[in-house]
Regions:
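Conserved N-terminal alpha-helical segment that immediately precedes and caps sugar-phosphate-binding
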Residues: 1-202
Length: 202
């Protein structure tokens, strides 16, 4: 019993160690191929983008499937309630099923975005693989609307979404749990930093 418990504890420790290690290996780059060399600079770059759009009162949209959808929905709430930003959900059941039924699942984001996204808005696309067709279509629509795009991806370094954003955050790991946890953690850190700038005391 004690031996099994010890093995479990070691595995948990190793998993946490891997998560922290990958967190500090996160790569943030822009279209001009410039890269942030430290975690702190990467976070500051992302924070500056969100703060700029908050000041402009831009609309903010999050895209994601599965676990990334859960993160997107969570951040839609947090960036509005705690960050004071104009977030809009793309996850209304009636709209999602309508778009999926009438146009196909690959268009569940891009079709409503054609009506909702305006020039100068901010779109955050979250995808562990960076290759989900509906996410790629959503990013493409955001680009046509001249919205600013941030991508959060993982797995392969040459995934499609990573090539399409104005700012691209990449987690060099093939595990869904690690990639999704880091995406969520970084976005939550951005919310907390916005709150601190607004004078909120923790």
């Amino acid at each position: 019993m004690n031996r099994k418990m010890k093995i479990t504890e070691n595995k948990e420790k190793l998993y946490i160690d891997e998560l922290v290690d990958k967190l500090y290996c996160v790569e943030v780059s822009g279209k001009a191929s410039e890269k942030c060399r430290t975690y702190e600079k990467a976070i500051q770059l992302l924070l500056n983008v969100f703060l700029r759009h908050k000041e402009r009162e831009s609309q903010l949209f999050f895209l994601g499937n599965g676990g990334s959808c859960a993160i997107a929905s969570h951040m839609t709430a947090d960036f509005m309630k705690n960050g004071g930003m104009n977030t809009y959900s793309l996850y209304d059941n009636a709209v999602t099923t309508c778009m999926g039924n009438d146009y196909g699942y690959e268009y569940i984001f891009s079709r409503p975005m054609e009506f909702l996204v305006k020039e100068g808005d901010l779109v955050v696309a979250i995808s562990s693989s960076g290759n989900s067709r509906n996410i790629i279509n959503g990013i493409a629509t955001a680009g046509k609307k001249n919205a600013e795009i941030i991508t959060f991806t993982g797995f392969s370094p040459d995934n499609k979404a990573r090539q399409m954003g104005d700012v691209n955050l990449y987690v060099p790991c093939g595990k869904y749990g690690i990639v999704e946890s880091i995406h969520n953690l970084i976005l939550q850190q951005i919310v907390d930093m916005i709150m601190e700038k607004d004078g909120v005391k923790f």
